[in-house]
A protein has these predicted regions:
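Conserved N-terminal segment of class I S-adenosyl-L-methionine
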Residues: 1-73, 87-90, 95, 114-200
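Helix-to-beta-strand junctions that scaffold the AdoMet/dcAdoMet cofactor pocket
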Residues: 83-84, 97
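A short beta-strand submotif of the Rossmann-like class I SAM-dependent methyltransferase core
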Residues: 73-79
């Protein structure tokens, strides 16, 4: 999906200097493998978390999970819409990591997806759950489809009181994983100039 390419692109920028990452509600998604420069990678899920030689899986309920540490970066992708107690869940993300990136389905109609308990979700609802405004947000829509479930909102939260510059993050972003399908053109690289122009610090 185009959405996952966008996630990979943003993590390469926003987590370029991260040494630890936790993916909350990982399911069995393998995208965490692409963040090769992050030494400590944990994938947490209430059942069957993703795991590999490079990624430690943690089977736990996030609301009762005790991290025992602060991660540099937390991901929570397409999870909150499934969680009845979305507000305490979202707020806890900021207690386990310095930087947080969240994605949610954007304005999907109720009943479109079984298991979603909060649709439709938009930036106002996400702001209510997290109690804060994102430092960067973007709505990513899948191309070549008119499905009502084609769009997702991605929001990034930088630590309060620390300098935040999209320009610097764009300059310092990590290269794509060397062994990740070298014959596949990275379409998002072509959008980098547009992205930077549209989001100048």
């Amino acid at each position: 999906m185009f959405y996952y390419e966008y996630v990979r692109y943003l993590v390469r920028a926003f987590a370029a200097d991260a040494e630890s990452l936790i993916d909350v509600g990982s399911g069995n998604a393998e995208y965490i493998e692409d963040f090769y420069w992050i030494h400590t990678r944990h994938a947490l899920d209430r059942k069957r978390p993703y795991s590999s030689a490079a990624v430690a899986g943690i089977e736990a309920e996030f609301l009762t999970f005790e991290a025992g540490r602060t991660y540099d970066f937390a991901l929570c992708l397409q999870v909150l819409e499934h969680v009845k107690r979305a507000k305490p869940f979202a707020e806890k993300l900021f207690s386990v990591a310095d930087r947080v990136m969240i994605s949610v389905p954007y304005q999907w109609p109720p009943g479109l997806e079984k298991g979603h308990v909060h649709d439709p979700v938009d930036l106002d609802k996400l702001r209510h759950w997290t109690g804060r405004d994102p430092d960067y947000s973007v709505v990513v829509s899948e191309p070549l489809t008119d499905s009502p479930g084609r769009s997702r909102l991605i929001a990034y939260y930088h630590p309060a009181g620390s300098e935040f510059s999209l320009r610097d993050m764009g300059r310092n972003m990590r290269p794509e994983r060397p062994d990740r399908n070298p014959n596949l053109p990275n379409l998002l690289s072509r959008l980098a100039v547009v992205w930077r122009r549209g989001n100048r610090a």
